[in-house]
């Protein structure tokens, strides 16, 4: 991704992407806010989280806490954290955007963010606390 956004097509100051999605990212959670807050190529940065993600559980065995399955230290100023963990029909799922889970709120979220619209504003997510974390409530 870094090489792509450093290419000449991105040489202007405009933000070419409306939404950048870090979907259950298999990257270190610790200190993510420092590099996340420097991402300049999108209007909104979404980070999706499922603490029970079966793919990232395997990664946890050899790596520190992963951003995509950790609900701690969510302190990036730019990121919009979307926590799917306790939502209906989420379970241990990793690939929500395929639409095979039966949760209409998840489908609506991905339809919106993949078409340059705001995902955190849809009914079914609730913001809790001062951080920019939204929790999936149900179907």
List PLM regions with ranges.
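Lipolytic serine-hydrolase domain surface
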Residues: 5-139
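Glycine-rich nucleophile elbow surrounding the catalytic serine of serine-hydrolase chemistry
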Residues: 1-3
């Amino acid at each position: 991704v870094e090489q792509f956004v450093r290419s000449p097509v991105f040489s202007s100051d405009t933000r070419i992407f409306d939404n950048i999605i870090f979907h259950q990212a298999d990257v270190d959670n610790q200190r993510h806010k420092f590099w996340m807050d420097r991402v300049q190529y999108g209007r909104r940065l979404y980070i999706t989280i499922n603490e029970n993600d079966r793919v990232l559980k395997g990664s946890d065995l050899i790596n520190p806490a992963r951003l995509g399955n950790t609900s701690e230290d969510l302190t990036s100023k730019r990121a919009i954290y979307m926590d799917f963990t306790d939502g209906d029909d989420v379970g241990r799922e990793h690939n929500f955007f395929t639409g095979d889970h039966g949760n209409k709120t998840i489908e609506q979220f991905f339809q919106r963010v993949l078409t340059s619209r705001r995902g955190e504003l849809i009914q079914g997510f609730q913001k809790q606390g001062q951080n920019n974390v939204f929790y999936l409530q149900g179907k």
